[in-house]
């Protein structure tokens, strides 16, 4: 049975902390396939500072090139509108019948799983991988995997804000992503 990891997020923009999560999960689980799953619109997040989706996909590909593993699953982008993980996983599972699916979330998402659409069915379809960046270890449900990762306080919001204020984002994102953001004039408004 094939082991597939899905790492979802808005990735607006993708940054160094996302890379650390991907790397830690990849090396811990050693999956056959690893997918970055950019959302079109998350139902649990406020939406502002949105850029053309092609920019996000380009920056994710830059991260994949740098990490040396991974692919992009753009199912939610193609579907458009609000993205419910349940719908995405259900469709993905139909395409990958003989696969064991792992879905990466942070402790912030773990602590609000009860708000997720069709969460009980979703728990039957995937094994949640809960990444914890806090000093305290996170207890998770028995059917889930907890992975402790180094704490790096970087957020996409912070990066967008720094760019709009004309501040440096060096090392917050890889050089290729930094150059792309500057070259395309993203987040400057």
From Swiss-Prot:
One of its GO terms (molecular function) is ATP binding. Transmembrane segments: none annotated. CDD domains: NMNAT. Its EC number is 2.7.7.18. Pathway: Cofactor biosynthesis; NAD(+) biosynthesis; deamido-NAD(+) from nicotinate D-ribonucleotide: step 1/1. The keyword ATP-binding applies. The keyword Transferase applies. It catalyses: nicotinate beta-D-ribonucleotide + ATP + H(+) = deamido-NAD(+) + diphosphate. GO terms for biological process: NAD biosynthetic process. It is an enzyme of class 2 (transferase). Keywords: ATP-binding, NAD, Nucleotide-binding, Nucleotidyltransferase, Pyridine nucleotide biosynthesis, Transferase. InterPro entries: Cyt_trans-like (IPR004821), NadD/NMNAT (IPR005248), Rossmann-like_a/b/a_fold (IPR014729). SUPFAM superfamilies: Nucleotidylyl transferase. Catalyzes the reversible adenylation of nicotinate mononucleotide (NaMN) to nicotinic acid adenine dinucleotide (NaAD). Belongs to the NadD family. This is Probable nicotinate-nucleotide adenylyltransferase.
